[in-house]
Design a protein with these regions (language model features):
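C-terminal, non-catalytic extensions of nucleic-acid polymerases
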Residues: 12-218
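Catalytic palm active-site di-aspartate
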Residues: 1-6
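Flexible, active-site-proximal loop/turn residues at the rims of small-molecule/cofactor binding pockets
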Residues: 9
Length: 218
């Protein structure tokens, strides 16, 4: 395990002296890394930028590992990869979310995947000419948030229903992707993705402000 410490420049030598004493007492060895920046949402979700330029992302920010489909994290959800990628670009490179979305034309980054288990099934619901149309879907579906589309609802045989995306947002099912289809034809609702990106940015910045206030008390 490990911990992060914020050390004044004039206390660095004292810090290393204390570490050496601890190693002698415990017969254990400490390892040290230096960050140029540490962006923390909470203890399980953070981004670290090392002084050598390398980065480390944990929890919901592990977009790079998810994108590469590393075996160790196949259990994690790859939904809406554009969100953690944009948050990462904002904090590590200063790229505004609007600019990031403008250059990300990979449809897979805007997709989410959901699965219905047990007695649950998916329904696609839309209204055309004042008539409700219901389409039964398969157990595993992929979709993105679109300007025009349907509401995707997970339904249980006991009558319970859960919207895949609550509120005003519409979805388009995309279980198969046409590699020849231009990205501009997907009708992606970028307002949804911007909202999600800014929610995470604001959450992190609030944590950062709170941490700075707490540190100032000492």
């Amino acid at each position: 395990d490990g911990l992060e410490t914020l050390i004044p420049n004039d206390k660095v030598d004292k810090y290393h002296e204390i570490c050496r004493k601890w190693e002698i007492m415990t017969q254990l060895n400490l390892e040290h890394d230096e960050y140029s920046k540490l962006i923390i949402a909470d203890v399980n979700n953070y981004m670290a930028v090392y002084k050598n330029g390398k980065t480390k992302c944990k929890g919901k920010f592990e977009w790079e590992e998810l994108e590469k489909k590393k075996v160790s994290i196949l259990h994690k959800n790859k939904s809406f990869l554009v969100v953690p990628k944009a948050v990462y670009a904002y904090f590590t490179k200063g790229v505004m979310p609007e600019d990031f979305l403008a250059q990300d034309n990979n449809i897979f980054n805007y997709c989410a995947g959901v699965k219905a288990k047990g007695g649950w099934v998916f329904e696609e619901r839309s209204v055309k000419d004042s008539t409700l149309h219901v389409n039964k879907l398969q157990k595993i579906i992929r979709y993105f948030i679109s300007n025009k589309g349907s509401k995707l609802v997970k339904c249980n045989k006991d009558g319970r229903e859960i919207q895949t995306e609550a509120g005003q947002w519409l979805q388009t099912v995309i279980n198969k992707v046409d590699p020849n289809k231009p990205f501009t034809e997907y009708d992606i609702n970028k307002s949804y993705y911007l909202d999600e990106i800014y929610k995470q940015i604001q959450q992190i910045e609030k944590v950062s402000q709170r941490s700075s206030t707490q540190l100032s008390l000492f």
